[in-house]
A protein has these predicted regions:
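Post-signal peptide N-terminal segment of mature Sec-exported envelope proteins
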Residues: 33-68
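...with weaker cross-activation on analogous glycine-rich loops/strands in unrelated enzymes
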Residues: 106-167, 176
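Catalytic cysteine-centered active-site loop
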Residues: 60, 79-129
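Aromatic- and glycine-rich peptidoglycan recognition patches
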Residues: 2-5, 29-41, 58, 149-190
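Acidic/histidine-rich, surface-exposed loop or edge segments in extracytoplasmic proteins
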Residues: 49-54, 74-83
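C-terminal motif of bacterial Sec signal peptides marking the signal peptidase cleavage site
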Residues: 23-27
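Bacterial N-terminal signal peptides that target proteins for export
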Residues: 2-16
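Extracytoplasmic/secreted envelope proteins and their assembly/folding machinery
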Residues: 66-70, 74, 94-98, 127, ...
Length: 190
């Protein structure tokens, strides 16, 4: 192989790596983990920033199937992100939801955009743990990320479990600026 061929091969490899990296970032977004402390401001946004009020009026009653889905999703907390992944060795966002619901006898389509058309579209105020939340992480209205409602705090704050490209499977809040701006809608599949 001559020097020109080697350089050309290296350029092609770099273009491929950049393309794959861009696809990963766009396909499942990224997030900061929500702090466990109730007094922490790391998951909140300063009052000067304008965010949508994205709260639920969930009454706190969970069915057995919802509890099972949440328990299964929690098992994967800390699992790394893997583009196209749907196993405990690594998940992308829709791989996580597909796996968790499959473990509970519910088949979901593999892609988040297809999952967004499964079940019943609901107002966020009606959302409860086990429902799916959909996001447009690249802006606009095209679904590119999905998460499972995990908890509804006493003040109505919605927290969800999902596979973040930067931190793997974590719990985030709709009160975080990134997710608040990217939120599209909720679906009930149970």
């Amino acid at each position: 192989m001559n020097l020109k061929s080697i350089r050309y091969s290296e350029v092609l490899r770099q273009v491929a790596v950049l393309s794959i990296s861009a696809t990963i970032i766009i396909s499942c977004g990224s997030s900061k983990a929500v702090s466990k402390s109730k007094n922490s401001s790391s998951s909140k946004v300063s009052k000067s920033e304008s965010l949508r009020k994205l709260d639920s009026k969930f009454d706190g009653k969970l069915s057995g199937s919802m509890k099972s889905i949440l328990k299964d999703a929690e098992r994967y907390l800390g699992t790394p992100y893997k583009f196209g992944g749907n196993t405990s060795s690594g998940f992308d966002c829709s791989g996580l939801t597909t796996k968790v619901f499959d473990e509970n006898g519910l088949k979901l389509p593999r892609r988040s955009a297809d999952q967004a058309n499964t079940g019943k579209n609901i107002d966020l105020e009606e959302a409860k743990p086990g429902d799916l939340l959909f996001f447009a992480t690249a802006g606009g209205s095209k679904v590119s990320h999905v998460g499972i409602v995990h908890t509804i705090e006493n003040d109505g704050e919605v927290k969800f479990i999902h596979a973040s490209t930067s931190k793997g499977v974590i719990i985030s809040s709709l009160n975080e600026k990134y997710w608040n701006k990217a939120y599209l809608h909720a679906q009930r599949v149970l």
